[in-house]
Amino acid sequence: MASDRKSEGFQSGAGLIRYFEEEEIKGPALDPKLVVYMGIAVAIIVEIAKIFWPP
C-alpha cells in the first residue's frame, strides 16, 4: 500500500513539472535589477518634480 501511494504522487508531480516546463513566456524578459533601478529612478523624478513644480 505504501508503495502505491508513492508512485501516485510521483505521477501527479511529473505532470505538473511537464506543464510548467512547456509554459511560454509572452512578453519582454527584463532583468530584475533593471526593474528595481527603474522604480528608484521614477521615485527620484517624482520627488524632484514635487520640489520644483509650483503648487
Curated annotation (Swiss-Prot):
Segments on the Cytoplasmic face: 1-31
User: What Pfam families does the record tag this protein with?
Assistant: Sec61_beta
Source domain of life: Archaea
Question: Which GO cellular component does the record give, naming just one?
Answer: plasma membrane
| The keyword Cell membrane is assigned to this record | yes
> What family does this chain come from, according to its entry?
Belongs to the SEC61-beta family.
Oligomeric state and interaction partners are given as:
Component of the protein translocase complex. Heterotrimer consisting of alpha (SecY), beta (SecG) and gamma (SecE) subunits. Can form oligomers of the heterotrimer.
Q: What is this protein called?
A: Preprotein translocase subunit SecG
